[in-house]
Amino acid sequence: MQYNLTRIDPDAPNEQYPIGKRETVSDPLEDQVHKNIYMGKLEDVLNGAVNWGRKNSLWPYNFGLSCCYVEMTTAFTAPHDIARFGAEVIRASPRQADFMVIAGTCFIKMAPIIQRLYEQMLEPKWVISMGSCANSGGMYDIYSVVQGVDKFLPVDVYVPGCPPRPEAFLQGLMLLQESIGKERRPLSWVVGDQGVYRAEMPSQKEQRREQRIQVTNLRSPDEV
């Protein structure tokens, strides 16, 4: 499995965000196992335990921009029960949150505010882009709307839709949990490699292409 390695680059230009450099590498734990099988397996178990705790206790930051935020908050109601994924503890401060959901239209005037809120979150932190407007600007191809929040934030999961249903948001949350379970992060600021390794996650569109091609009985709009 290929991983995307991100390291802090203090010499990067100020307009670059995040300040770091990225490259594609192999799984660092597999390399460690080849060097020393005992230490490699021990590090694998420790990473697995830490990632299990992180992905099953994701605290979201209570933040929204537009109509997609309404669908996001609907996922916290009893019929959907987001507590099944350990993400029901909504935080009012970014310093106490684990991930931020950019739900709605991001205007240029809001971009520096969102970036400041992201910087106030403690590591490790993740970002979910929810809705067409957050993903690519949506139907607002105008001067005042940012054409995708990944222009200034590192996005981990994209949830399509205008607006996405709460079930789509829950699926995006599960994809984020799957990604966190495969991450390789430093266990301490003084121990091990300080780079962040993220597994390459293929799009669901590509993964389900064969499944869509095999469908012959298409449902009518009234049945969807």
Curated annotation (Swiss-Prot):
* Superkingdom, natural source: Bacteria
Q: How is the subunit organization of this protein annotated in UniProt?
A: NDH-1 is composed of 13 different subunits. Subunits NuoB, CD, E, F, and G constitute the peripheral sector of the complex.
What function does this protein fulfil?
A: NDH-1 shuttles electrons from NADH, via FMN and iron-sulfur (Fe-S) centers, to quinones in the respiratory chain. The immediate electron acceptor for the enzyme in this species is believed to be ubiquinone. Couples the redox reaction to proton translocation (for every two electrons transferred, four hydrogen ions are translocated across the cytoplasmic membrane), and thus conserves the redox energy in a proton gradient.
**Taxon lineage:** Bacteria, Pseudomonadati, Pseudomonadota, Gammaproteobacteria, Pseudomonadales
This chain's protein is named NADH-quinone oxidoreductase subunit B
- UniProt EC number: 7.1.1.-
Q: How is the cofactor bound?
A: Binds 1 [4Fe-4S] cluster.
Q: How does this chain sit within the bilayer?
A: Peripheral membrane protein
This protein's cofactor list reads: [4Fe-4S] cluster
